[in-house]
A protein has these predicted regions:
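A conserved FAD-binding loop/helix module that cradles the flavin
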Residues: 296-299, 445-471
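FAD-site-proximal beta/loop scaffold in flavoenzymes
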Residues: 253-284, 364, 376-449
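Glycine-rich dinucleotide-binding loop and its adjacent helix/turn
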Residues: 123-140, 198-218, 241-306, 421-435
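Long hydrophobic segments that form regular secondary structure
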Residues: 280-320, 358, 382-398, 405-406, ...
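Feature captures the FAD/FMN-dependent oxidoreductase FAD-binding
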Residues: 78, 140, 145-149, 197-246, ...
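Extreme N-terminal leader/targeting segments of oxidoreductases
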Residues: 3-43, 91, 110-144, 253-264, ...
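Beta1-alpha1 glycine-rich phosphate/pyrophosphate-binding loop at the start
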Residues: 5-32, 61-73, 78-87, 109, ...
């Protein structure tokens, strides 16, 4: 620790966002950054704790105090080396991770935490700017062939580590571009897709083979996959969306899954044309986002940029507190209210509302009936009841269902492979190995829908088990 009084003398400083009036006019990244000296000053606030709980809270186990100290000393190459020992893609997590590390920072007990996520992003961007990032081409090949199905963060992590181990890795992606959730599920205003392209270009130079527009079971059979490869990793995500199937009016035109909406917009930003007959667009629409999570927030920001007339986001749960509750102490993740850059751009947020029915006219959505709910805890279980007389009509002609995901899609590849599922419908695994010989699983497909950083960790761990398997 170069400055033992840094956390006392220096206040936390963030890069902040571009002005609202500017950023809602495009899909460029909304976050700004600090200059190099400010980054060094922020790194000096890291206290060299006896027990660094930031490291404990980070899903990939990032050695945060070590690389923060390197930043403080201006050793960007050293900081990048430390950072990438545990994280394959700090340029992704440095932009979109909710930073559980900062919530568990020791300084956060009584003050603002050390700046970690933004400094992480600064480290990797400095590394690219200073030409410190080069293709790490394996010095030998083992002769083993690995197939990875899915090119999201888990699949890319698997491919990275197994390629570096000398295996020949082929990644199959059903969409026309590589990246999975990173590419199609996260708006450009949070993650510019050029950042993904930059990493994929490195992978290609390192020898990873990518097969976009290739759906296993259609363009290549499961049997061919099993015959041609020594091991297969299923990294297909958890893409079965939670629906409101039993809600009256669900069939009306104008009700869409959030991911369909976001995926289309990401394609439009890339320059693809969406046929008018299937194009989901919020221009001049009263938009209602059902679901209060990050994906819902992304729908809010996207709708605002598409010039929606109004945007409302509702959540069935109660409004979180501004502060930690007694049963939610540090260093655990705080169950407090979170406000995203999209929320700051102009939307109405409401809580404790359940969707009763969708109201239409001539087959098209016109409004949504909601009702207030009350949550109580009984025998440790939260239960909900509707409050009579609190019914309300919200005008809406475009609804985004952002209710999370149930599991990976079973129909098709997974069912044909005859993998086992757990009680939640995720692919059942023992040390990432499925019940099917030489078939492994990583990421959301086995864990359930979660954070990108968890998918990265899962992919890295799965890669180690796969390496052990093929080298027996």
């Amino acid at each position: 620790m170069g400055n033992p009084k840094g956390f006392i003398e220096i206040e936390k400083k963030l890069g902040g966002y571009r002005p609202v009036s500017e950023r809602i006019g495009d899909f460029g990244e909304v976050e700004q950054t600090l200059d190099e000296q400010d980054r060094i000053s922020q790194a000096s606030r890291c206290m060299d704790c006896g027990v660094p709980f930031c490291h404990w809270a980070c899903p990939v186990g990032s050695n945060i105090p070590e690389w923060q100290d390197a930043v403080y000393r201006g050793k960007w190459d050293e900081a990048y080396s430390i950072l990438t020992k545990t994280n394959s893609f700090p340029e992704f997590t440095g932009r979109i991770c909710p930073a559980p590390c900062e919530k568990s920072c020791v300084l956060a007990i009584h003050d603002e935490s050390v700046t970690i996520r933004e400094n992480e992003c600064a480290v990797v961007e400095h590394a690219f700017d200073l030409n410190l990032v080069h293709p790490n081409i394996p010095k030998f090949r083992t002769g083993k062939k690995i197939a990875v199905v899915g090119s999201g963060p888990a699949g890319l992590s698997v491919a990275d580590l197994l390629n570096q181990a000398g295996h020949t890795v082929t990644v199959f992606e059903q969409d026309n571009e590589v990246g999975g959730l990173l590419r199609y599920g996260i708006p450009d205003f949070k993650l510019n897709k050029g950042i993904i392209d930059r990493r994929i270009e490195l992978f290609v130079k390192e020898g990873v083979l990518f097969k976009p527009n290739t759906k296993v079971g259609e363009h290549i059979s499961e049997q061919q996959l099993m015959d041609d490869f020594d091991a297969v990793c299923l990294a297909c995500g958890a893409m079965e969306p939670r629906d409101l199937k039993s809600t009256p009016g669900r069939e009306l035109k104008g009700i869409h899954f959030a991911m369909d909406f976001l995926k289309q917009q990401n394609k439009v930003v890339k320059g693809e044309r969406i046929p008018e007959s299937i194009h989901i667009h919020a221009k001049n629409k009263k938009v209602l986002v059902i679901g209060g999570g990050d994906t819902g927030s992304d729908c809010v920001g996207t709708s605002i940029r598409q010039r929606a007339t109004s945007v409302t986001q509702i959540e069935i749960l109660d409004k979180p507190s501004d502060q930690r509750m007694e049963d939610n102490p540090w260093p655990f993740w705080p169950n407090t209210i979170r406000t995203s850059s999209s929320h700051l751009e102009g939307c109405e947020r409401r809580w404790s509302l359940n969707t009763r029915r969708f109201i239409g006219e001539n087959g098209s959505l016109k409004a949504v009936e909601v009702v207030k709910v009350e949550w109580t805890k009984t025998n440790g279980q939260m239960t909900m009841r509707e409050i009579p007389g609190t019914e309300e009509i919200i005008q809406a002609d475009l609804v985004m269902l952002s209710l999370g995901f149930l599991s990976p899609v079973h129909e098709g590849l997974l069912d044909r492979l005859k993998v086992d599922y757990d009680a939640r419908g995720n692919v059942k695994a023992n040390d990432f190995a499925t019940n099917v010989d030489k078939v492994f699983v990583a990421g959301d497909a086995t864990r359930g829908a979660s954070l990108v950083v968890h998918a990265i960790r899962s992919g890295r761990d799965a890669a180690l088990k796969m390496h052990e398997f093929v080298m027996r």
